[in-house]
Amino acid sequence: MLDLVVIGHVSIDTLIFPDGRRVTMPGGAAAGVATSAALAGAKVGLVTKIGTDFPKEWLQALSSVLDISGVQILPGKTIHIQMIYHEDGSVDAPVEMGVAQKMGEIPIPEEYLDAKVFHISPIPPEEQLKLLNRLKGKRVTVDFNPTYKEEYIKRRDLLREIVSRVEIVFPNEREALMITGAEDVKDAARILHGWGAKLVVITRGEKGVLVYDGSFREFPALPIKPEEIVDPTGGGDAFAGGFLAGYSRGRPLEECVRLGLERAREVLKKWGDWSITV
């Protein structure tokens, strides 16, 4: 039996720097969560769609730490994200979706259905709801992404429906405020809990983690030297993966948070969203 099944995107990411340098690497929130959870000791399955352009060595790297029976390889291109860094520090991130459409209808292997916990990584909210309808009676957690900011604001009723049907939500501080419309992070946590989430886990970067289940608990970030931070983009996914590795195996909350913080610290020291090196 799997401890955790992660559903969402795996991508090909190209970083484009102001001096013209281009670096291509594997990405995708689902792979970030899944690889982190696997390295934290969980038995993990991944459900995603990739195209025939996805490098075989990347797929082999995934298969070395988790089950890839749920990875669909389809004619066409894998979702491709460009991270264009500008000299003023701003970043543009155009996305080509490729075969990564209609994720709410993606086949889930029968042997995955008895997994202890399912995690839905950021996909359009209507697709998240389709998956929740298919996973009725299962223990489900969910994550969000500011890419869907307009949909979140326009469809707050849809978000409430999603949150009401999951055990845990994993927004970062910015996402929590955006989703709820609150101006204070603790108010945002109360709102998300009021919508029905049993546990609200808000990552706050160097300020650590805020957890709310009717009462607040705050956990400091683990120390890391500024010069050790290579790429901050994968920290949230790595945290969620580590946390879920503990949660899916019945570990105490404090241990789940510690596992998440440890995995986040490690992924900050390397480029990319994955916790494994390819």
Swiss-Prot record:
Cofactor: Mg(2+)
Keywords: ATP-binding, Kinase, Magnesium, Nucleotide-binding, Transferase
Activity response to pH changes: High levels of activity within a broad pH range of 5.0-9.0.
Active-site residue numbers: 237
Matches recorded under InterPro entries: Carboh/pur_kinase_PfkB_CS, PfkB_Carbo_kinase, PfkB_dom, Ribo/fructo_kinase, Ribokinase-like
Annotated EC: 2.7.1.213
A Pfam family it matches: PfkB
Superkingdom of origin organism: Archaea
Temperature dependence of activity: Optimum temperature is 90 degrees Celsius.
GO BP annotations, alphabetical order: fructose metabolic process
GO molecular function per UniProt: ATP binding; cytidine kinase activity; fructokinase activity
Described function: Involved in nucleoside degradation. Phosphorylates cytidine to CMP. Can also act on deoxycytidine and uridine, but is most active with cytidine. ATP is the most preferred phosphate donor, but it can also use GTP, CTP or UTP.
UniProt protein name: Cytidine kinase
